[in-house]
Amino acid sequence: EQKIDLMNKALAFINPQLEDFGITAIESMAAGRPVIAYSAGGAQETVIDGETGIFFKKQTWESLFDAVLNFHPTNWDSAKIRTHAEKFSEEIFKEKMKKFVEDKYEEFKAGLVQNKLF
């Protein structure tokens, strides 16, 4: 509850660390809030620079400071940010994973048939 309330009141979420995925950045975008993120790791796959947030290139306080100074809270489309975050929902992840496994299984079966092992 408190986290949701804080995200709804925030102008942006600052994600200065290197992470593989970064669930809090996704949660922030689900609340329609842009992300100010270090341009490395999972942020490069979840944040769209200029659309759902902005990147800073170096993991230094100066680079983060410049990003915050250049951030304009009125330049963001909350609905568009929320829509982007939906791509990372549990349901969509399950659908993509299921399709991936099914496709690989079909490829495996096709290889067995082709090699007359099935």
What are these regions (language model features)?
Residues 4, 26-30, 44-45, 51:
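Short alpha-helical segment that forms part of, or immediately flanks, the ligand-binding pocket
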